[in-house]
């Protein structure tokens, strides 16, 4: 995919490869201008990695681009069409409040989507106003950057700009636009959309484009579309295992929110688990617990089955044989997920080698944590540093019994105790974006226009494995509440 434009003073270096797909996949339009754009947070390090001049982005002209008031030379804004199963129900969807401005080609030749979220109505808006509120946009900025620092594949946030306009949800709220950066915004739902149009030519065009963009090493494969499915399964198995290992709950794992690239996308109702419980749900709209913490691997494979269904015409000319190929391929998700999860959990427990009983040891710890309502993140920190033993959980007979088995397990490997502790330090974060801390930062920013709380939180979250003293205050768990924490989509 060759780049088509010259580099501009700000560093914008655009290509529009997605716009070369069949026109059914998008609608071209310009972002709706806003009254009084103001930059409230810019990700300087991300800007630099994209080949952009951070200071130029802070200028009046730079902010105008981030707010959608100016379209840079070489950009060709478009809203993407896609479909999706939302809580199990199929719908034709699309970018209802976002525009892909263009694709930035970095100095190293990498390609990233630059998307404005909250940029106005599109042909896919349905009853929405196409705008976004400041709180949810800042929330996505905080959590996506925390996920990046944790080493979890994710879309990223370049900037949040206020619009000088109000939007109306339950109440009047300040409007904002998030500049999101992604390897691409191709989703499982994009393939569902292509399949729903019943155009094999369009489906093939999308698959070929996706392979060229994300998996060029399989272009010459004997069965490239099967290889594409296998690649996505592998990436999603790895991604969801990483979610589970840090206690991340996505909250809205619809098929339109599962990327082909393997990046986490859409941070609307997500949250991190405090007390360990597999049935934990934070999303206010997930009334049945479909997307609960413990369900995420199962929803992942369900979503991937929908991708496989969409690809059937490309897998084999005989539909029954295609279905069998898809089924055999999807069945590999479970073992792949378990492989990644076990490897990650071994690292969290300081274990270097493999033993057949490792899974049993891990599940015994988790079951004891659930019984005593132990904090997920802090339990692993306590094991890492041998601290915080004065609680019912650590005093319990069940934990004492497990701890003895764990020490015996560590003794059966060649690596030293200090090596095990270093492995644990490198895999057990000192800090996660705890819900009450995120809410504190958002309240100060939205209600008081005070961004200092958020800036301190972002600084602490930027190096979660540093285990520095300034991170300790963020390790405290929230006070017990009669009202469970709830998250909202922000739409």
Swiss-Prot record:
The reaction(s) annotated as catalysed by this protein in its Swiss-Prot or TrEMBL entry are:
L-seryl-[protein] + ATP = 3-O-(5'-adenylyl)-L-seryl-[protein] + diphosphate; L-threonyl-[protein] + ATP = 3-O-(5'-adenylyl)-L-threonyl-[protein] + diphosphate; L-tyrosyl-[protein] + ATP = O-(5'-adenylyl)-L-tyrosyl-[protein] + diphosphate; L-histidyl-[protein] + UTP = N(tele)-(5'-uridylyl)-L-histidyl-[protein] + diphosphate
The protein's required cofactors: Mg(2+); Mn(2+)
Q: Does the keyword Magnesium apply?
A: yes
Query: Which principal EC class is assigned to this enzyme?
Result: transferase
The active site consists of 256 (proton acceptor)
One GO term in the molecular function aspect is: ATP binding
Query: Which keywords, in A-to-Z order, does the entry hold?
Result: ATP-binding, Magnesium, Manganese, Metal-binding, Nucleotide-binding, Nucleotidyltransferase, Transferase
**Its domain of life?**
Bacteria
Here the disulfide bonds are none
- EC assignment: 2.7.7.-, 2.7.7.108
Residues given in the record as Mg(2+) binding sites: 257, 266
Question: Binding residues for ATP, per the UniProt record?
Answer: 94, 96-97, 117, 129-130, 180, 187, 266
Q: Give the family this protein belongs to, as stated in its UniProt record.
A: Belongs to the SELO family.
This chain's function reads:
Nucleotidyltransferase involved in the post-translational modification of proteins. It can catalyze the addition of adenosine monophosphate (AMP) or uridine monophosphate (UMP) to a protein, resulting in modifications known as AMPylation and UMPylation.
PANTHER family associated with the record: PROTEIN ADENYLYLTRANSFERASE SELO, MITOCHONDRIAL
Q: What is this protein called?
A: Protein nucleotidyltransferase YdiU
Taxonomic lineage from the root: Bacteria, Bacillati, Bacillota, Bacilli, Bacillales
